[in-house]
Amino acid sequence: MGRFRLVLIVGGLFAVALGATSGRFLVVNQPHKSDVIVVLAGETDRRPARGLELLDQGFAPRLLLNVPAEAKIYQWSQAEIARKYVEGLPQASSITICPIYGHSTRDEAQDVSGCLQSVSGRRVLLVTSDFHTRRALSIFNRVLPADYSVAAAFDAGEFGVQWWRHREWAKVNFDEWLRLIWWELVDRWR
């Protein structure tokens, strides 16, 4: 009985330690100088802002802004809105809009391959939401091999590594872990 209790306590402490570090494990923020910055689709505030910040800091001379090709906001396509946004930027000549037709990060990596050919870059800096960095890096490495680094776009309203402090953070942490596990165990091998 004493041994069982000890195993239960040690197992419980191990589970708590894993849970406490699970949010931090998801986040990879290690940008390196690259040939091109690729801002992943799915969010239109923090990701583009982080990409522009890295462009201004000289991490790469070009930026690809991924935009859902078929998404509409009222009567305008997201691509039209993105074009108008880019035209108003001082860095407009360094930015290319990359239309994304897929609905998953894996599909997005396949769509990006065509856009990368036009900017000829082997060293790619991915920009995505902080919680999405580890999975995105793994997916791009598998689907579209290149020399990748990744930069996290932080949004405290959406996620924090101390995920237990806010309900929304806990939901995002749980959802991203499900997606990461599914990618590693199933989708990666298709």
Spans of features found by a protein language model:
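Structural signature of transmembrane alpha-helix termini at the membrane-water interface
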Residues: 20, 24, 51, 181-188
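Intrinsically disordered, low-complexity sequence elements enriched in Ser/Thr/Gly/Pro
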Residues: 1-3, 45, 121, 177
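A transmembrane-helix-recognition feature enriched in membrane-embedded lipid enzymes
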Residues: 165-190
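A structural signal for short, hydrophobic/glycine-enriched beta-strand patches
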Residues: 23-167
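N-terminal type II signal-anchor transmembrane helix
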Residues: 1-28
